[in-house]
Amino acid sequence: MARILIVDDSPSQLLGIQRIVEKLGHEFITAEDGAAGVEVAKRELPDMVLMDVVMPNLNGFQATRTLSRDASTKHIPVILVTTKDQDTDRMWGLRQGAKAYLTKPFSEDELAEVIERIFNTAEAPPPSAA
């Protein structure tokens, strides 16, 4: 079982993603914006971060860049989940350090596939022990 940090300023989006993460058998922690997400990630060191892009205080691109450049968090894979569906946004997100970029709305199966693919790559550390 992995512990996944979900960062989204929309309560309904947070709830929807939480349900999927729980259904996959993973634990979750949450943050309501990019700044809080960076703080929680540094403190809790989750196995993965699911990060919205359009948020107050620190957007998801900035938060991803911060996490990918910090020695204590650069090993944590970040999946950007956002309504921003332009190719330039996708490329920018990946350049900031995201391992994947998923546009909303997405299916439960699509999110599950991306999470499992990231956990099964050599770069990602194994999920935390339960």
Name these PLM-found stretches.
Residues 44-50:
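Active-site beta3 strand of CheY-like receiver
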Residues 99:
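Short, glycine/charged-rich "phosphate-handling" switch motifs in NTP-dependent
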Residues 55:
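Receiver (REC) domain active-site loop signature in two-component systems and cognate sites
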Residues 106-116:
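C-terminal output helix
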Residues 1-12, 17-21, 49:
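Conserved acidic segment of CheY-like receiver
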Residues 25-32, 40:
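Short hydrophobic/Thr-rich beta-strand motif most characteristic of the beta2 strand and flanking loop
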